[in-house]
Amino acid sequence: MISKTKNLFFRTFWQIPQVLDASDIKEAREYIKQFWPHLTRVQRDDVDTLIGLPNPYLVPAYNESSAFTFDEMYYWDSYFMVQGMLGDPKNKQLVMGILDNLFFLIKRYGMVPNANKTYLISHSQPPLLTSFVFDVYNAYQLDRRWLEQAISYAKKEYYNVWMAEKKPHHHQVYQGLSRYYDVNVHHDLAEAESGWDMTTRFGRKCLDYLPVDLNTFLYVYESDFMKASEILQDQEGVVYWRKAAAKRKKAINSLLWNERRGNFFDFNY
């Protein structure tokens, strides 16, 4: 009965979309291309709460009719916006500059803050730096020397922040898995680090959870470090990072997988 009802619903209210080709989305692509300048900012010096960055960057939104405007660059927003720029060689300088800004923040603060605002340096955002590095490395066919330097920044972030070597037991808290955190030890601010600000997902107790997404991102980091080691012909690094990734995968499957429900869930440790 349910199956028949579902079939009737889809036949009545749902149409399978046609496959689009380049001509169908030409107008949308042109709009996006012309919109990038509205999102681009240049601020090389610290001004009030805004932290200066060495290169132009993108802000997450712009609306000319709104009195509010963004002037800061956000960590994971930047990664996803750059996905829309990688296919056009004309964007290479801006894309490379945005990634270099993240490296600059790691050099200055030992981490990538939520955004380049002084009141947002108490926490980060979901770690996407290795994905960013490899997207740029592959898109622009960069050399191994560049990759080695870029990966070194990601490793510094990995160890300082997510593995809690700089501030022990703040992020990495249970059986090798990590949580979102804020130096003010406040649940809502830790939730902001998740990028889900704000959400019912953690029941306003974000500090108590080992999140699926965060630990998956860190598994990607460890896998990417292994891949970089292979490219750089560092066999010792390959072995080390393969073991690290396998260890995290085992912990994720052990703690975050719910066999009865057939899915992964955040774990209240």
Model regions: which residues?
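Acidic, mature catalytic/reactive cores of soluble proteins
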Residues: 1-269
